C-alpha cells in the first residue's frame, strides 16, 4: 500500500522503496516514535496511516504527524478516513494536543475531508533539507 500512496502523490519526493520495510520494522520496535494503523473492512485491507508523535514547543505538548494516510481507490468515499480520525481522537495512547498532516495540492477530496474535520492551513511553509549520503 505504501507503493500505492507514493505512486499517486505527485507532490511527494521520490521514495526509495527499500525504506518501506525499514519503516515498518522501526514502527513495530519503537511504538512511541511511530505507529502504523491498518484500515480493515472484514478481512480486506483498505488502507493505512503512519503516525509520528513528537513534543512540540510551539503547541506545548505532543503533536502527532499523520505522515502517511492512504485509502485504496475502491474504498474511498466510504468514511474510512473519517472513522480513522474519530478513532484516533478516542484511542491515541499518548496525550496529544494536535494533529498535523500534509496534503498534495491536487488532492481536493482529501483536503475537503481534512477541512471538514477542523484541520486548517498554517501560514508557514514546510521546508526540507536532506543530508548528503
Spans of features found by a protein language model:
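Alpha-helical elements of Rossmann-like donor-binding domains used by nucleotide-donor carbohydrate transfer enzymes
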Residues: 1, 22-23, 44, 83, ...
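Conserved GNAT-fold acetyl-CoA-binding loop/helix
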Residues: 2-25
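A short helix-loop-beta-strand connector motif used in the catalytic cores of GNAT acetyltransferases and
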Residues: 25-38, 65
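Conserved beta-strand in the GNAT
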Residues: 36-38, 44-53
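Conserved acetyl-CoA binding element of GNAT-fold acetyltransferases
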Residues: 61-73
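Conserved acetyl-CoA-binding loop-helix of GNAT-fold acetyltransferases
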Residues: 71, 77-90, 112-116
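Conserved GNAT acetyl-CoA-binding A-motif
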Residues: 85, 92-103
Amino acid at each position: 500500500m505504501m507503493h500505492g500512496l507514493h505512486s499517486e502523490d505527485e507532490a511527494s519526493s521520490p521514495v526509495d522503496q527499500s525504506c518501506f520495510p525499514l519503516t515498518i520494522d522501526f514502527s513495530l520496535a519503537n511504538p512511541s516514535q511511530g505507529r502504523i494503523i491498518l484500515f480493515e473492512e472484514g478481512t480486506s485491507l483498505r488502507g493505512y496511516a503512519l503516525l509520528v508523535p513528537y513534543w512540540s514547543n510551539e503547541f506545548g505538548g505532543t503533536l502527532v504527524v499523520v505522515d502517511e494516510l492512504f485509502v485504496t481507490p475502491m474504498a474511498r468515499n466510504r468514511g474510512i478516513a473519517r472513522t480513522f480520525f474519530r478513532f484516533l481522537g478516542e484511542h491515541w495512547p499518548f496525550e496529544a494536543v494536535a494533529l498535523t498532516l500534509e496534503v498534495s495540492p491536487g488532492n481536493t477530496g482529501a483536503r475537503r475531508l481534512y477541512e471538514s474535520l477542523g484541520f486548517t492551513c498554517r501560514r508557514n511553509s514546510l521546508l526540507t533539507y536532506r543530508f548528503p549520503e
